[in-house]
From Swiss-Prot:
<dbReference type="GO" id="GO:0050567">
    <property type="term" value="F:glutaminyl-tRNA synthase (glutamine-hydrolyzing) activity"/>
</dbReference>
<comment type="subunit">
    <text>Heterotrimer of A, B and C subunits.</text>
</comment>
<keyword id="KW-0648">Protein biosynthesis</keyword>
<feature type="active site" description="Acyl-ester intermediate">
    <location>
        <position position="177"/>
    </location>
</feature>
<dbReference type="InterPro" id="IPR000120">
    <property type="entry name" value="Amidase"/>
</dbReference>
<dbReference type="GO" id="GO:0005524">
    <property type="term" value="F:ATP binding"/>
</dbReference>
<dbReference type="Pfam" id="PF01425">
    <property type="entry name" value="Amidase"/>
</dbReference>
<keyword id="KW-0547">Nucleotide-binding</keyword>
<dbReference type="InterPro" id="IPR036928">
    <property type="entry name" value="AS_sf"/>
</dbReference>
<dbReference type="GO" id="GO:0030956">
    <property type="term" value="C:glutamyl-tRNA(Gln) amidotransferase complex"/>
</dbReference>
<keyword id="KW-0067">ATP-binding</keyword>
<keyword id="KW-0436">Ligase</keyword>
<feature type="active site" description="Charge relay system">
    <location>
        <position position="153"/>
    </location>
</feature>
<dbReference type="InterPro" id="IPR023631">
    <property type="entry name" value="Amidase_dom"/>
</dbReference>
<feature type="active site" description="Charge relay system">
    <location>
        <position position="78"/>
    </location>
</feature>
<dbReference type="GO" id="GO:0006412">
    <property type="term" value="P:translation"/>
</dbReference>
<protein>
    <recommendedName>
        <fullName>Glutamyl-tRNA(Gln) amidotransferase subunit A</fullName>
        <ecNumber>6.3.5.7</ecNumber>
    </recommendedName>
</protein>
Amino acid sequence: MDLTFASLSEISEAVNNRSISAKEVTLHFLKRIENLNPKLNAFTSLNPQAVQEAEAVDARIANGEDVGLLAGVPFGIKEMFCTKGLTTTAGSKILENFVPPYDATAVARLKKSGIVVMGKLNQDEFAMGSSNETSFHGVVKNPWDLERVPGGSSGGSAAAQASRLVAGTLGTDTGGSIRQPASFCGIVGVKPTYGRVSRYGIVAYASSLDQAGPMVSSVRDAALTLEVISGFDPQDSTTTQKQVPAWSQNLKADVKGMKIGLMKEYMTGALDPDVQKTVENSVDTLKQLGAEIVEVSVPMTAFAVPVYYLVAASEASSNLSRYDGVKYGYRAEFKNLSAVDLEEFYSQTRGQAFGAEVKRRIMLGTYCLSSGYYDAFYNKAGQVRRLIMEQYLEAFKKCDVILSPVTTAPAFKIGERVSDPLAMYLNDIFTTSTNLAGLPGMSVPFGQSQSGLPIGIQLTAGHFEEQKMLNVAFALEGASLVKGKHPHVI
């Protein structure tokens, strides 16, 4: 077994039957992190207890205990998740030394299944970004081309997974933050139905949109990880009590008779020719496998980006008001003169510690929620959001799964769009509507640009229909033009 490219279940099975120890696996990936992370900047910190955690897994197996589905599997965790005893910064200076006293539910469930936490992964500050250029920890580089972005906000997770610094990673998706970097880095990323995975212990950006999901190397690995982290959590009132299906066991590449919807609004002239060709190839593949392709229309997605930025910024302006330097996190220093009043203390702390993009969105959100504009902006955005969801529900009466591009183009160069917020926001043009409607969505690698950059296909399903989506992805994965290809940095 080649540990570097082994699947989650292969590693777990080998650890469980003691053909390799969890400690050996951990040391193997720690060496990879040591060698490659300086080039990528994917990890912000390492878990000093990783080897001891692996030894504990080995000891439990030696005692005949059932360690779990992911015994000894090394995982990287996005900075957005609280991890007991490990710094959790959300990519921001304002939380630079924050160490949570507890684990996020998703992390706790992964630990219960036997994983070894290798460390924390870089991200855009408070998940606000599409390129991983807003992080307090610096820019993450795409392992396929070190001059390009890995996508965002879960860029560290995508880069670490694509370069196999770990066997699996965890990300969050508020408007495409799992799917877009997954596409840019050629991995599988899944955003489940809103409420499928607990948000407890995830640093809040936009509470009605945030969702956690796996960023891994295969559809089966994604299904397996999703099984572990999903399910009702009394700590999060938005989680569903629906039973968690055995997605990984029910995976099948048989799409014969399935109706695949092709989103009319997304097949525009704005698509890069390589992306257009990849979508067309995926459609042809599914036709050959027996699926029926039908055109579907969700006209209100034309307003998805402005609606998303109104809703997300408004919720962020409320959520981020808790960071004031009083109880935890960064606090402004007043060496020569103390703060005149509490307001100055707050403004100095936040002014010094929040990045430019976070400040921009807080200002936008505060403006949208102000008394004179609440109805015109926030309320109106909520009404359009409802229409988007209703139109999606109508579309799913005609098809099982909707297929579309993830982004208009492959990964762009570092610095290319950072000074143009509008161009950066339009990266989310195909992904935000899924979050607004609370639907499950994913990116599966399928093609490459002429310059060798990976291109993913986005699949979206009805609420709690992850199995259909995963099955179509499994079929596409089997016929993928990039299967078995890896970044040169490896």
